[in-house]
Protein backbone atom coordinates (compact mmCIF):
# COMPACT_ATOMS: atom_id res chain seq x y z
CA UNK A 1 0.00 0.00 0.00
CA UNK A 2 2.84 2.39 0.87
CA UNK A 3 4.51 1.66 -2.47
CA UNK A 4 1.33 2.57 -4.35
CA UNK A 5 0.96 5.79 -2.37
CA UNK A 6 4.60 6.76 -2.96
CA UNK A 7 4.29 5.92 -6.66
CA UNK A 8 1.09 8.00 -6.97
CA UNK A 9 2.71 11.00 -5.27
CA UNK A 10 5.77 10.67 -7.49
CA UNK A 11 3.69 10.52 -10.69
CA UNK A 12 1.60 13.53 -9.61
CA UNK A 13 4.75 15.49 -8.81
CA UNK A 14 6.28 14.78 -12.21
CA UNK A 15 3.03 15.71 -13.98
CA UNK A 16 2.77 19.00 -12.07
CA UNK A 17 6.41 19.78 -12.78
CA UNK A 18 5.94 19.19 -16.50
CA UNK A 19 2.84 21.40 -16.67
CA UNK A 20 4.56 24.18 -14.72
CA UNK A 21 7.37 24.30 -17.29
CA UNK A 22 5.02 24.88 -20.21
CA UNK A 23 5.39 28.52 -21.20
CA UNK A 24 2.21 30.56 -21.45
CA UNK A 25 1.54 32.44 -24.65
CA UNK A 26 2.18 36.17 -24.33
CA UNK A 27 1.02 39.28 -26.21
CA UNK A 28 3.04 42.25 -27.38
CA UNK A 29 1.67 45.44 -28.95
CA UNK A 30 3.99 47.10 -31.45
CA UNK A 31 3.46 50.57 -32.90
CA UNK A 32 3.97 50.56 -36.66
CA UNK A 33 3.24 54.11 -37.83
CA UNK A 34 3.46 53.30 -41.54
CA UNK A 35 0.88 50.50 -41.19
CA UNK A 36 -2.28 52.42 -42.08
CA UNK A 37 -3.55 50.74 -45.22
CA UNK A 38 -5.14 47.40 -46.15
CA UNK A 39 -2.37 46.94 -48.73
CA UNK A 40 0.30 47.40 -46.02
CA UNK A 41 -1.61 44.97 -43.79
CA UNK A 42 -1.53 42.33 -46.54
CA UNK A 43 2.20 42.83 -47.14
CA UNK A 44 3.06 42.54 -43.45
CA UNK A 45 0.68 39.62 -42.95
CA UNK A 46 2.32 37.70 -45.82
CA UNK A 47 5.78 38.54 -44.49
CA UNK A 48 4.95 37.38 -40.94
CA UNK A 49 3.51 34.12 -42.29
CA UNK A 50 6.77 33.57 -44.17
CA UNK A 51 9.15 34.30 -41.27
CA UNK A 52 6.98 32.53 -38.70
CA UNK A 53 7.94 29.14 -40.08
CA UNK A 54 11.58 29.97 -40.81
CA UNK A 55 12.75 32.35 -38.09
CA UNK A 56 10.37 31.68 -35.21
CA UNK A 57 9.65 27.94 -35.54
CA UNK A 58 5.91 28.69 -35.56
CA UNK A 59 6.36 30.74 -32.37
CA UNK A 60 3.99 33.46 -33.55
CA UNK A 61 0.50 32.24 -32.77
CA UNK A 62 -1.63 35.05 -34.16
CA UNK A 63 -1.53 38.75 -34.90
CA UNK A 64 -4.17 41.44 -35.09
CA UNK A 65 -3.86 44.72 -36.95
CA UNK A 66 -5.27 48.09 -35.88
CA UNK A 67 -4.91 50.24 -38.98
CA UNK A 68 -6.49 53.29 -37.35
CA UNK A 69 -3.85 53.36 -34.58
CA UNK A 70 -1.05 51.90 -36.70
CA UNK A 71 -0.47 49.00 -34.31
CA UNK A 72 -0.10 45.27 -34.46
CA UNK A 73 -0.76 42.92 -31.52
CA UNK A 74 1.11 39.65 -31.70
CA UNK A 75 0.60 36.57 -29.56
CA UNK A 76 3.71 34.41 -29.33
CA UNK A 77 5.34 31.53 -27.47
CA UNK A 78 8.13 33.03 -25.31
CA UNK A 79 10.32 29.96 -25.72
CA UNK A 80 10.44 30.53 -29.51
CA UNK A 81 10.15 34.31 -29.94
CA UNK A 82 10.61 37.52 -27.99
CA UNK A 83 9.46 41.12 -28.52
CA UNK A 84 12.84 42.36 -29.78
CA UNK A 85 13.13 39.57 -32.35
CA UNK A 86 9.55 40.23 -33.49
CA UNK A 87 10.25 43.97 -33.86
CA UNK A 88 13.41 43.22 -35.83
CA UNK A 89 11.45 40.89 -38.13
CA UNK A 90 8.84 43.61 -38.74
CA UNK A 91 11.63 46.11 -39.51
CA UNK A 92 13.16 43.59 -41.93
CA UNK A 93 9.76 43.49 -43.63
CA UNK A 94 9.96 47.23 -44.33
CA UNK A 95 7.87 48.60 -41.46
CA UNK A 96 8.95 50.65 -38.46
CA UNK A 97 8.41 48.77 -35.19
CA UNK A 98 8.36 50.95 -32.06
CA UNK A 99 11.82 52.57 -31.96
CA UNK A 100 13.32 50.24 -34.58
CA UNK A 101 13.33 51.77 -38.06
CA UNK A 102 12.62 49.63 -41.09
CA UNK A 103 15.62 48.36 -42.99
CA UNK A 104 16.29 50.65 -45.94
CA UNK A 105 16.26 47.93 -48.61
CA UNK A 106 12.93 46.49 -47.45
CA UNK A 107 11.41 49.97 -46.99
CA UNK A 108 12.24 50.89 -50.59
CA UNK A 109 10.15 47.97 -51.86
CA UNK A 110 6.96 49.16 -50.13
CA UNK A 111 4.24 50.80 -52.24
CA UNK A 112 3.83 54.59 -51.77
CA UNK A 113 0.78 54.19 -49.50
CA UNK A 114 2.91 52.20 -47.01
CA UNK A 115 5.71 54.76 -46.75
CA UNK A 116 6.16 57.04 -43.74
CA UNK A 117 4.11 60.24 -43.64
CA UNK A 118 7.27 62.35 -44.01
CA UNK A 119 7.99 60.45 -47.24
CA UNK A 120 4.49 61.18 -48.58
CA UNK A 121 2.93 57.88 -47.53
CA UNK A 122 -0.15 57.04 -45.55
CA UNK A 123 -3.76 58.09 -45.96
CA UNK A 124 -4.61 61.03 -48.18
CA UNK A 125 -7.36 63.54 -47.49
CA UNK A 126 -10.70 62.11 -48.60
CA UNK A 127 -9.20 58.66 -49.23
CA UNK A 128 -9.34 56.48 -46.12
CA UNK A 129 -6.98 53.62 -46.77
CA UNK A 130 -7.74 51.55 -43.66
CA UNK A 131 -10.60 49.89 -45.54
CA UNK A 132 -10.18 47.61 -48.52
CA UNK A 133 -11.74 49.19 -51.61
CA UNK A 134 -14.85 47.57 -53.06
CA UNK A 135 -14.59 46.51 -56.67
Residue ranges and their predicted role:
Residues 1-25:
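Bacterial Sec-dependent N-terminal signal peptides
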Residues 14, 31-34, 107-108, 123:
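Processing junctions and N-termini across compartments
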Residues 15, 40-43, 117, 132:
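General secretory precursor processing signal
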Residues 28-56:
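N-terminal targeting signals for Sec/Tat export/insertion, comprising classic cleavable signal peptides
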Residues 56-64:
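A short linear hydrophobic-aromatic micro-motif
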Residues 64-108:
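Mid-chain, structured segments of secreted extracytoplasmic proteins
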